[in-house]
Amino acid sequence: MTCRPIWPIVLALVTGTMQAAPSGRLPIPGIQGDDDRTLEQRTTYPWGSIGRLNNTLGPFCTGTLIGPRRVLTAAHCLWNRRTLDWIPPCALHFLAGYRRGSYLAHSLVASYQLGGGQAARRSGPNPNQDWAVLTLADDLGHAVSPLPTLPLDSSLLSGYRETGTFVQAGYSRDRPHMLTRNPRCDILGFSNDDRLAQHACDATFGDSGSPILLRQGDAYHIVAIHIGIDNRTGRGVALTGKAFHGWLEQLEEADPGGETIKACRRRSALPWPSA
């Protein structure tokens, strides 16, 4: 299935100061019909691999451990819209398996690379390359199992549907201190050479960078990451594995180059969000 180009997108990061919206009030952007999200109480595989990406400058997003010291997230989570520059790594903290003030493992971010080698320091992220790989200061592999990635495009979709199901999980604005899981998730169509997809997963602000997982039996693979909401349809927008899987494979073998952000003005203390 092919859909028209998905743009403009409401980028789905959220400031850490925002509170849960009272029930019965305004609808939550990105929640499509009934709210299918459920609170995930477990921190076992694969849920413990997903974590909250805190930012001492304000916004938080979601990320997933893909290697002992590597986290996959959305690039726009690292863009400071006030200063029109990339956020210094020392302002970022990854908390794997975060749950109401506790977590399985934590690390500061030492550096990060912008997806696809994009090097535009002051232009902000391109939606077709809206992913980034964080290099953590600490190895978290002893506490959390990294999740692998797989490509996703229109030629693979039907086969994936036959052999598995799609699940999205992330930290939403209205439930910022618990991982929510959406088991009723599906890919609806593609655009931009299959690098972007519309999806039917309930995901809202704060879920940026959260994985859309393909579950096949007991195995989970990241096939896309949530990056925003289509203004026209209200559907979720994801960056597919076609955009990042091959690049990540190169990263495992050797540094593929691109823009590595290392500059840091200060090291900050761990932000303790209120439960």
Labelled PLM ranges:
Residues 64, 202-226:
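Catalytic nucleophile loop of clan PA
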Residues 127-131, 136-203, 248:
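Chymotrypsin/trypsin-fold serine protease catalytic domain
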Residues 46-93, 190-191:
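Catalytic histidine site
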Residues 19-66, 180, 243-275:
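Protease-domain processing segments flanking chymotrypsin-fold serine proteases, especially trypsin-like
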Residues 74-77, 223-232:
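Short beta->alpha transition motifs characteristic of CBS
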Residues 8-16:
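Bacterial N-terminal signal peptides
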Residues 22-45, 59, 85-142:
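Conserved catalytic-core segment of clan PA serine endopeptidases
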Residues 1-7:
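Bacterial N-terminal signal peptides that target proteins for export
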